[in-house]
Each structure stands twice: as C-alpha cells, then as structure tokens.
C-alpha cells in the first residue's frame, strides 16, 4: 500500500513555547488516521503544517509526494481541508457555495452529488446564514469534498455538536471510506477516534504518547479490573488472568455463602488509556 | 482566465447581496448629495453652482466609501472569519482572487459614479462631464489609489470589530477636510495644511479640474502624482502586512 503522508521528527515552536517536539508518523493511502489529544497538545499545529499553512522549524514532511511548505496549485487540487471554524459566505446558498468552490478545481464533483453526500438535500437552496451549526459543519465537509480530493484534513469535525449531529457527521465521514479517501482527523473525543479511525496517535505536550489501532492501545494497557464490595469497602483487583481469578473468587464466595456485591469485570476503555497517557504527571 | 471570470461572477453576486455595502457605500453618498444639494445647491461654491460642486464631492465620497472603506471591511471580515484561510487551501491562485476582488470594487464604483452623475443631471440640472476620457481615467486612478490604501490598511487592523471603527475614524474626517462638501478656503490654516496631505483632496481637485476647469488629466500632474504616491504607499504596506489567516491572540 502506498504512503499518503510521512512525518518525521517534526518540530515547531512559537517563541519560547515548543508546540510540537519531535513527532513522527505515517499514513497509508486509504487510511483514516486520528490525532487525539487535549487542547494545546499540538494537534492543530501539526495538521496546519501538513496543510501548508505553517512553516516547520525542523523535521521532514511529505504529503502526497510533496513538501506542503513548497506546494503548488496542482497539489492543492488533491487535498481537502475542513478547518476548526466553519468559514463561508453567509449570503450564498448551499448549492452556490459548492458551485463557487467546485469551480476552483479541474475535476470537481457535481453539486448535487455533494449535496446528497452531506445530506443537505432539503437545504440545497437555503442561504448559509439560515443553516444550523450542524448543517454548516456538514457544508464545511462538502466544500472540502467538492474538489474530489485524495486526502482530507478534518480538524475537530464535530466539536460543539449535539449527539445526534455527531452521529450524522460520523456517518458522512464513514461513507468517505468507501470512496477510498485518505483522512487525517483531529479530535479530543475518544469515542469519535474509536468509531472512525483505523489508527490513532495520542499527542501529549507535543509528543506522541502512544500510537496504534484503537484496539491495540487498549490491549497494551492496564490489565482487567475486577471490583466488588466487601463489608462496605470497595475491593479492586487487577489481573492478567481474569478467568482464573474470577473463578477463585466466586468459588470462595460460594463456599462461604457470601454474595460478591456490586461485582464488576471490565477492560480499560480507550478513555482510561487516554487519560493515563495525557494526564499531567503528579509530583 | 477561466478562474478569474468564475471568481468575478461570484464576487459580483456577493457584492450585490450585501445590504451593508449597498447602504453605506452606495445609498448614503446619494442621500447626502440630495440633502446638501437641496440645502445649498443654488449657492455658488468655488466659482461653480453649489450642486455642481457637490457632485464632485459626492464622487469623492463614493470613492472612499466603495474603494477604501467597503473593500477594507470586506477583506478584514473575510480574513477574521477564516474565509481567506479556506481559500488558501484551494487551487485558486492568490493573485487571481485579489484581482477579481479589486475588479469588483472598480465595477461597483464606476456604476456608482454613473448613478451620481445621473442624479446630478436629473435633480440639479448638472451638465454631462466634459473630457469623458480624462474623467473616467481620473475615477479609475482614484479608485485604484484608495483600493491600495484599503488593502494596506487591512494589514494594520487586528480584529473584525475594529474594522469599521478604524475605517470610519479615517474616512469621515478626510471627507470633510478634503473639502468635498465645503470650500477649503473657509477652514483655519492648520486644517488646510492637513487637507493638503490627504489623497481625497487631490482626487477632488483632479476631478473638479477635469469637469469644470477644462483640464485633461495630464494637465494636472501634481494631483495625479499625489494620488499615485498614496496608492504606492498603500501597496507597499499591503505587500508587507497583508495576511490570509486570522490575526492570532
């Protein structure tokens, strides 16, 4: 499989503040890759360097075979960008906005096809000013898609959405997988990364704290937890062999004629992995 | 060229749909023209009929409102909204975009000039401007100089909310000091010194000279030079300070 994005030892500082301190990763063509991390972890800086908006201080970056800092119009034909804030002309209709931006590309998708893809058929001829926040965000995605790019950058595509709008956006993004697009998305929502991404890199203070498939990340971490209450106190056991430990526990409890109150067996969620990776180290 | 036509078509559509621009840059100068024209259009100002004098003043008002104020505010709003940033991620070349935007401004101002002259002729019996070629060239020179100043100014304005405040603080005093609505001779001397530095003063004198003084544009090299210098100052600042992404922090 060919590589769409290669980042190697990327560094960027703003004055004294080092926003990105040696980040390396690769994204294969057709992959959905997530950059996950809290605010200020360096996600947007990294993405904006890949989009060609910012100059890097050190490291090498190749996006679709070119250095974004020196990219030309032909390169821009192949990328689509959804920025954190949806910026569009408030007095144009949905269809006009798509036609305007589509006109910048050699081989745009048809307006109606994109309208359907983002599920705004009912709003096709409404002006942007009258759209809801979620509808604007979907048009945002449409504007990034109308040039039929190979690579899409989505910077926090669902921040500020209500749960229903997020699910709709997820469906739109998932449907792009079928089109064979490579996607780099940033998010601080774990469920979003878990749901959408093939692979995830967790950024923390400008470095990659962990990287892998969402399942691998959870697998690499703390073992299974068994919790129950005894004499009003909570007992927490961690084990690599949950089956055996659970068997021993229940046998003993049965023999004693006791109930294991509030018994719970759980694997760590990506959330806990994430928190353990991104939490400030305590003194 | 295809991209330029595409962008120009949409810029004109965006312009025509903007109520703010329609009112502040198009209607307000006309309203003031009519009001002042009925108030002292029959007096004599600077050796011509008051309404004829006001016609030139209104063209000056139009050029700062459309080419300077309107353009500055549109660019700052688009920049701070992130629209310019989004455009940078598309294959639309920056020069094509800016040329289309400036052409739109120029077209809007020339339409406005036609309307101002038509109102002057029908409401106050003004005569059709003589030396049409020099007249149009003077309007274009003025619009270009003020557009350059406007683009330059965008680089110095940090926030969207600041744009109209800064623009108004510059252009209303300039409008009055340049003598667009009253004769400058009646001002105290220090204000006349300020007026002598303002680009609008030279635009007014140039157009006045072409329309009522029997001059061609090349008979007034001092006015042309002053406008050109101001335009170059604007262009110089624009090249150094113009930015595509929202001002941070």
Name what the model sees in each region.
Chain A
Residues 59-67, 74-75:
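Conserved ABC transporter NBD signature motif
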Residues 99, 103, 108-124:
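Conserved ABC ATPase "signature" region
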Residues 216-283:
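Short, charged/small-residue-rich alpha-helical element at the C-terminal edge
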């Amino acid at each position: 499989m060919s590589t769409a994005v290669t980042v190697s030892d990327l560094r960027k500082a703003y004055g004294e503040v080092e926003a990105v301190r040696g980040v390396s990763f690769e994204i294969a063509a057709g992959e959905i890759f997530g950059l996950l991390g809290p605010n200020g972890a360096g996600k947007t800086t990294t993405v904006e360097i890949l989009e060609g908006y910012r100059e890097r201080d050190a490291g090498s970056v190749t996006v679709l075979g070119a250095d974004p800092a020196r990219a030309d119009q032909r390169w821009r034909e192949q990328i689509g960008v959804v920025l954190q804030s949806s910026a569009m002309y408030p007095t144009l209709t949905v269809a006009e906005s798509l036609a305007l931006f589509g006109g910048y590309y050699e081989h745009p998708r048809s307006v109606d096809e994109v309208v359907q893809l983002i599920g705004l058929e009912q709003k096709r001829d409404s002006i942007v000013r009258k759209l809801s926040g979620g509808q604007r965000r979907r048009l945002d995605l449409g504007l990034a898609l109308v040039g039929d790019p190979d690579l899409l950058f989505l910077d926090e595509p669902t921040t500020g959405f209500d749960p229903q709008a997020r699910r709709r956006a997820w469906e739109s993004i998932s449907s792009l997988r079928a089109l064979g697009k490579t996607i780099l998305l940033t998010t601080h929502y774990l469920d979003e990364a878990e749901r959408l991404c093939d692979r995830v890199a967790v950024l923390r203070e400008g470095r990659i704290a962990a990287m892998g498939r969402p399942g691998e990340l959870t697998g690499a971490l703390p073992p299974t937890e068994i919790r129950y209450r005894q004499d009003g106190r909570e007992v927490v056991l961690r084990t690599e062999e949950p089956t055996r430990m659970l068997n021993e526990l229940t046998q003993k409890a049965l023999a004693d004629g006791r109930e294991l109150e509030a018994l719970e067996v759980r694997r760590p969620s990506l959330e806990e992995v994430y928190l353990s990776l991104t939490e400030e180290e305590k003194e | 060229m295809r991209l330029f036509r595409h962008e120009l078509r949409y810029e004109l559509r965006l312009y025509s749909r903007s109520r703010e621009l329609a009112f502040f840059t198009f209607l307000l100068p006309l309203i003031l023209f009519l009001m002042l024209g009925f108030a002292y259009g029959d007096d004599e100002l600077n050796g011509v009929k008051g309404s004829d004098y006001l016609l030139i003043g209104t063209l000056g008002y139009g050029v700062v409102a459309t080419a300077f104020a309107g353009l500055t505010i549109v660019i700052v709003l688009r920049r701070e909204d992130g629209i310019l940033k989004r455009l940078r991620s598309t294959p639309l070349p920056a020069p094509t975009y800016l040329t289309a935007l400036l052409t739109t401004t120029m077209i809007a101002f020339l339409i406005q000039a036609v309307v101002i002259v038509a109102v002057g002729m029908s409401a106050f019996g003004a005569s059709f401007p003589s030396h049409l070629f020099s007249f149009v060239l003077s309007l274009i020179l003025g619009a270009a100089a003020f557009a350059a100043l406007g683009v330059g100014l965008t680089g110095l304005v940090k926030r969207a909310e600041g744009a109209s405040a800064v623009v108004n603080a510059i252009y209303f005093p300039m409008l009055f000091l340049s003598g667009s609505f009253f004769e400058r001779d009646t001002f105290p001397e220090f204000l006349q010194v300020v007026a002598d530095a303002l680009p609008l003063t030279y635009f007014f004198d140039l157009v006045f000279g072409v329309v009522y003084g029997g001059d061609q544009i090349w008979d007034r090299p001092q006015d042309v030079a002053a406008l050109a210098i101001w335009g170059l100052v604007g262009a110089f600042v624009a090249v150094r300070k113009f930015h595509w992404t929202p001002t941070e922090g």
